[in-house]
Amino acid sequence: MEDTYIDSLDPEKLLQCPYDKNHQIRACRFPYHLIKCRKNHPDVANKLATCPFNARHQVPRAEISHHISSCDDKSCIEQDVVNQTRNLGQETLAESTWQCPPCDEDWDKDLWEQTSTPFVWGTASFCGNNSPANNIVMEHKSNLASGMRVPKSLPYVLPWKNNGNAQ
């Protein structure tokens, strides 16, 4: 029994393709081959069913119920189910004692108490308090030469997006 288990794990073992009996595929490539061969042989694929315990098992549809009852891989799944049901009874979830901390913030109140004027792009802003010495308007700085200006809109056709037409 142990020899067959070790033999089934050998990645170099040759397996016969269920779709084309002439195909001998290494075990490590078998799942990929099954997908490819299933597409190439749809007539044979319609006659075969896939084992729910091991997708490598392709069995004639008439024999699938017998295969399910006697599949070697079923024992692994059943053992997992048994272990999960045992652990479910033993496992008790601890109640969380976390509580939300009290909230000291009131954003609406802070908004009404705000004394500074909000920033608005494109309007003059004054620095500091309202003394005449501090009423200096911050001017917009530009890196362009004095005679140039920034375009107000983009051109409809961008020169670098001319769809490959050479100019």
Swiss-Prot record:
Record flagged with keyword Nucleotide-binding: no
Main location: cytoplasm
Effect of loss of the gene: Mutant mice grow normally and appear healthy but males are sterile due to massive germ cell apoptotic death after postnatal day 14 with meiocytes ceasing meiotic progression before the early meitoic phase. There is also increased transcription of LINE-1 and IAP retrotransposons accompanied by demethylation of their promoter regions.
InterPro entries given in the database record: TRM13/UPF0224_CHHC_Znf_dom (IPR022776), UPF0224_FAM112_RNA_Proc (IPR051591), Znf_C2H2_sf (IPR036236)
Location within or outside the cell: Cytoplasm
Annotated binding of Zn(2+) 1, by residue: C17, H23, H33, C37
Keyword check for Zinc-finger: yes
UniProt-recorded Gene Ontology molecular function terms: tRNA binding; zinc ion binding
Phosphoserine modifications at: S8
Residue stretches spanning the membrane: none
Residues bound to Zn(2+) 2: C51, H57, H67, C71
Record's keyword terms, sorted: Cytoplasm, Differentiation, Metal-binding, Phosphoprotein, Repeat, Spermatogenesis, Zinc, Zinc-finger
ZnF region ranges: CHHC U11-48K-type: 14-41, 48-75
Example of a GO biological process term: spermatogenesis
Similarity annotation: Belongs to the UPF0224 (FAM112) family.
Role description: Required for spermatogenesis and is involved in the suppression of retrotransposon transcription in male germ cells.
Name of the molecule in the record: Gametocyte-specific factor 1
Originating species: Mus musculus (Mouse)
Designated gene of the protein: Gtsf1
